[in-house]
């Protein structure tokens, strides 16, 4: 059998094809080298402060001369929130609660309400600093000194820290909390309750087990904006959840 050979025509065609491919590769490489990568979003580096045992990531704008007074007022108000938590939460649970980090901003242009960020995906998708993950986030420092906020939600920082504790220490699907939440929904005990304004409304805690836990924690340790407002009312209105909070947070004497 004669050996396999490439004809002169085939050889010329092959060489031309190789030259064309090499040329395309060189052009593609050159284009890739010249193409500027997308610049990542620019985020400030917060300054760490310790307030009442909590690590606070502080927006540097709150520390400059122009906003010094606003920054001092905000941190003083935040200290007030954290002091009230310190004086009521048992030491063992308090030590874990202090592991929950807080991020304080002067004036976030997009976000308003205080919130907790359990995951990074939402932050990245919406153009926010991914370092906010697992932080209690106070987007607007002025809310800490807002009279309406104190009238409505005097334990708002505890509420957000309860979310962090639920996520990082317990688990959002903690079986006993979830069971108490589902039982309260089935019983309809939160379908129409008194709001701090005197109106009758659907309880905010019915949104999900996370809000149910945070709202109940406010009533257990302090004052909530929805009935049951305080610990004795929670014990009477939702005894099953009250018992779970005693197990989770420790009894209050």
Residue ranges of each PLM-predicted region?
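Acidic/histidine-rich, surface-exposed loop or edge segments in extracytoplasmic proteins
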Residues: 49-72
